[in-house]
Amino acid sequence: MSSRYRVEYQLKAHRKDAFIEWIKGLLAVPFVLHSVTERDNAQEKYRRVFEDVETLINEKITVDSDESLTRAAGVSRLDKLVPTIGTFFTPLPLTEAFLRQNARRAISERAYVSPSFNDIRHILNTAQIVQLARAGELSLVTFDGDVTLYEDGASLAAEDKVIGRLLRLLGAGMHVGIVTAAGYDDAENYERRLFGLLRRLERADLPNEAKRRLCVMGGESNFLFRCYERDGRAGFERVPESVWMSAELHQWNQQDINATLDLAEVMLRALREKLRLPAETQIIRKVRAVGIVPGQRFDPELGREIRVPLLRETLEEIVLTVQGRLENFPPAQRVQFSCFDGGSDVWCDIGGKDLGVAFLQRFYSPERPIRPEQSLHVGDQFAPVGSANDFKARLAGCTAWISSPQETVALLDDLLAELEAQKNM
């Protein structure tokens, strides 16, 4: 009988990343053939694989940027090998990144465990931040909220390590955005979730202009709030849509938006019954979102209210069902929407994080918008089909895929070290 890990792994095909899985397959060959008998050479064999992938990425960038090549050759070799591959906004120094991560993770020293999804994810992250730092043009760093800056459902406390790194980014001249699915249309809710960051900002030795480079994009792309400080007190103020929202979104028909959310709500209610969810489960309708969230139940043994969680498989079933129906619904086809599994709940938002990042790129620099190769989005949800709202951010800029706030801290430490090294060269 397969282990629980193997069973769940096979069930999660829609959560796999085709590019990472393809690289895993390339690395499996030298691992199987050489890892035991020629372990000393494993690093060199893995290095050659990443060198070849690096070359394929560079070729794809060239083909994608040259219309004459695109017309003549059709698509790059990498597009043929990984048909779902997206756009690369920068080259990726994968060879160097592998050697760095190998020094940390001893990938080539392992005789029984082949290079894993997480190994490759970290290598890709390292390659991206090294390239961005060396290019010297990084201008915008955006973050998801839950599981990226703080634990799922938590808030950003003043003692959280990531805050110091965010302040250093602001001090280095970066624009910092928090692009979150949390769809509050008032500043108070964001101030409550990010109170630790605001309190540290008040004490930080940063000019007001640097603090103004911090923004929150709520509801993925629906509500923009900018940081301010008055009389020593920091907070967020809402920015009028006319200042930052694109003309295309202004032209979306409100009836189409309402119809999309109405259908999503009807489906959530039907699925609540069909999947026999706990009676406490709630369906919440907002201005530009609708979601299903776990409720509370009194536990007589504990003597207090506890959350009644929803099964992970149930959350994924809801996401894929609602998304599949909306994709074939004419009003939803005339707008943009995002269905995703938030880890404990499911939401359907109007818009998406690609729009949220793009809006920030234009808001911070209206005359010359920040380009995708000058942007980095850090998030935890990049699965390519359903259930992952950070995935769309890949359309607007470079990305780093993390799995916890601790990984975010480590990633920012590496990024800041690279930026400092380039500054001192």
Curated annotation (Swiss-Prot):
Residues that bind Mg(2+): 144, 146, 380
Binding of ATP, residues: 104, 122
Catalytically driven reaction(s): IMP + H2O = inosine + phosphate
GO terms, molecular function: ATP binding; IMP 5'-nucleotidase activity; magnesium ion binding
EC number per UniProt: 3.1.3.99
Cofactor list: Mg(2+)
Keywords: ATP-binding, Hydrolase, Magnesium, Metal-binding, Nucleotide metabolism, Nucleotide-binding
Active site: 144, 146
InterPro entries in alphabetical order: HAD-like_sf, ISN1
Domain of life of the organism encoding this protein: Eukaryota
Modulation of this protein's activity: Allosterically activated by ATP. ATP binding is a prerequisite to magnesium and substrate binding. ATP binds to 2 of the subunits in the homotetramer inducing a closure of these 2 subunits and the release of the C-terminal loop, thereby activating the enzyme.
Major enzyme class: hydrolase
Functional summary from the UniProt entry: IMP-specific 5'-nucleotidase involved in IMP (inositol monophosphate) degradation.
PANTHER family: IMP-SPECIFIC 5'-NUCLEOTIDASE 1
Family statement drawn from the similarity comment of this UniProt entry: Belongs to the ISN1 family.
Subunit structure and binding partners: Homotetramer.
Record protein name field: IMP-specific 5'-nucleotidase 1
Protein species of origin: Eremothecium gossypii (strain ATCC 10895 / CBS 109.51 / FGSC 9923 / NRRL Y-1056) (Yeast)
